[in-house]
Design a protein with these regions (language model features):
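Long amphipathic alpha-helical segments that form oligomerization/scaffold cores
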Residues: 53-87
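A short glycine-rich, His/Asp/Glu-containing loop-to-beta-strand
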Residues: 1, 76-121
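Short, structured patches in soluble enzyme cores that scaffold and shape functional sites
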Residues: 51-58, 71, 89-93, 113-116, ...
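Short, conserved beta-strand element in jelly-roll/cupin
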Residues: 1-5, 53-56, 109-115, 127-140
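Generic beta-strand structural signal
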Residues: 14, 20-22, 32, 48-54, ...
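Ligand-binding loop in jelly-roll beta-barrel domains
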Residues: 9-11, 26-60, 146, 157-174
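Short acidic-glycine-tyrosine-enriched beta hairpin
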Residues: 7-25, 124-125, 130-133, 138-166
Length: 174
């Protein structure tokens, strides 16, 4: 929630708001800063942001830096049955929906919400590094591990089916 402005030495930048995503590729290098927009600084309010860092493949480390401002309207949303929640596909693919982030590594970033007492099974590509970050709420993973908010779980590369059962309304990244 909130709003943040980004500027960088390659000329990239913009202001993202709740539900938007900034995807920055450092590549051959750049200097950047992130700060509250003047409007948000004046009005105040809650600010929450998650940053994920993905190592570029060796062949792409000297690529030109790039900034992608992705608005929430451009992120495909997959609604679950019975109003159980939804998944937003930021990067990669899910169920035929492609995320708008342009990546160098094969990476899926899914932003999900699952309502209390519902469950879902998410299928990830075999061989991928997979991490679940519970931003808010509480889930049981694969019927055995309780994961609370502000926690993360790393899966074995052969865990291609990940079952989530929400004990509370839960927001997560996978």
């Amino acid at each position: 929630s909130g709003e943040v402005t980004h500027k960088d030495s390659s000329g990239g930048g913009g202001t993202i708001q709740t539900g938007d995503v900034q995807w920055m590729t450092a590549g051959s290098g750049l200097v950047h800063e992130e700060f509250h927009s003047p409007e948000f600084a004046q009005a105040g309010g809650l600010f929450e942001m998650v940053q994920l860092w993905v190592n570029l493949p060796a062949k792409d480390k000297m690529t030109q830096p790039r900034y992608q401002a992705i608005t929430r309207q451009d992120i495909p949303r997959i609604d679950m049955d019975e109003g159980a929640g939804h998944i937003r596909v930021i990067a990669g693919e899910m169920g035929g929906h492609l995320g708008p982030a342009q990546t160098f590594s094969p990476v899926n970033v899914w932003d999900g919400e699952l309502k209390a007492q519902y469950e879902t099974t998410l299928h990830v590509p075999e061989g991928h590094n997979t991490i679940l970050v519970v931003l808010k709420g509480e889930v049981v993973v694969n019927e055995s591990h309780k994961v609370q908010d502000s926690s993360m779980v790393m899966f074995a590369k052969d865990d291609i089916a990940i079952q989530l059962q929400a004990l509370q309304d839960t927001q997560f990244l996978l």
